[in-house]
Curated annotation (Swiss-Prot):
<comment type="subunit">
    <text>Homodimer.</text>
</comment>
<dbReference type="Pfam" id="PF08501">
    <property type="entry name" value="Shikimate_dh_N"/>
</dbReference>
<protein>
    <recommendedName>
        <fullName>Shikimate dehydrogenase (NADP(+))</fullName>
        <ecNumber>1.1.1.25</ecNumber>
    </recommendedName>
</protein>
<comment type="function">
    <text>Involved in the biosynthesis of the chorismate, which leads to the biosynthesis of aromatic amino acids. Catalyzes the reversible NADPH linked reduction of 3-dehydroshikimate (DHSA) to yield shikimate (SA).</text>
</comment>
<dbReference type="GO" id="GO:0009073">
    <property type="term" value="P:aromatic amino acid family biosynthetic process"/>
</dbReference>
<feature type="binding site">
    <location>
        <position position="217"/>
    </location>
    <ligand>
        <name>NADP(+)</name>
    </ligand>
</feature>
<feature type="binding site">
    <location>
        <begin position="131"/>
        <end position="135"/>
    </location>
    <ligand>
        <name>NADP(+)</name>
    </ligand>
</feature>
<dbReference type="InterPro" id="IPR022893">
    <property type="entry name" value="Shikimate_DH_fam"/>
</dbReference>
<dbReference type="Pfam" id="PF01488">
    <property type="entry name" value="Shikimate_DH"/>
</dbReference>
<feature type="binding site">
    <location>
        <begin position="19"/>
        <end position="21"/>
    </location>
    <ligand>
        <name>shikimate</name>
    </ligand>
</feature>
<dbReference type="InterPro" id="IPR036291">
    <property type="entry name" value="NAD(P)-bd_dom_sf"/>
</dbReference>
<feature type="binding site">
    <location>
        <position position="66"/>
    </location>
    <ligand>
        <name>shikimate</name>
    </ligand>
</feature>
<dbReference type="GO" id="GO:0005829">
    <property type="term" value="C:cytosol"/>
</dbReference>
<dbReference type="InterPro" id="IPR046346">
    <property type="entry name" value="Aminoacid_DH-like_N_sf"/>
</dbReference>
<keyword id="KW-0028">Amino-acid biosynthesis</keyword>
<keyword id="KW-0560">Oxidoreductase</keyword>
<feature type="active site" description="Proton acceptor">
    <location>
        <position position="70"/>
    </location>
</feature>
Amino acid sequence: MCKLEKFNYALFGNPIDHSQSPKIHNFFATQTGILHIYKAINIPLDQFSSVVSDFFKKNIKGANVTAPFKKEAYFFSDKLTERAKIAQSVNTLKKISDKCILGDNTDGIGLLSDLVRLNFIKKNFSILILGAGGAVKGVLLPLLSLGCSVYILNRTILNAKILVKQFNKYGKIFVFDRQNFKQQNFDLVINAMSRNTEKKNFLPLSLITSKTFFYDMNYSTRNTPFINWCSKAGGSFISNGIGMLVFQAAYSFLEWHNVLPEINYIINILNIK
């Protein structure tokens, strides 16, 4: 584990070896000239609260949180932004005072910003989301606020129903039952399952058209199974989630420093399409 005195911002997760966040935040620091020294820390699964508490007792100002600790970060926070309250998930922590840690969630605005950049979304789109885990909670509100109809396809239907019940007051959200569905076409398909999920058929081909957009919230130096499936299925508009990562990182940076980095510059540096 890195010594806490060596940096003032961090990413907490398990595992974090694959993370691009330190590279992105180093770009932000160089671009803005702000003292922003950012490290990734792998936390044992049963030590989140103790490690993070120790972190904030030092002269430390903020942290990002990734899987599997976003729910724990939600309960760890002394104060929450409205979007974090709704998501019941936190990916950004900010030290307000010695007695107050603010929890925020920038995943939703990060996803929406990247979808807009790619021209993958419009008002009232019909969207199918694959998965009903914690990653989905953080991104639903911006999609629903845009007037989109969101359908949740999950292996365990009960989990999808719980998610729909939590968010149906914010917009049009439904459970998609793969075994019993009415024929329809989706404008956008978002994969929110694990990047290592291997499937021969992520969804029925009858649900997509040549104009359907495909977005994988995961990112990797290699194509994920979902990206490969989309290509084989004939998808023409496909993107992984590294753009979302850059945007959510930028909005975390904004939370900490009141400065929004020039995001397209970072995207170009990372050669993101």
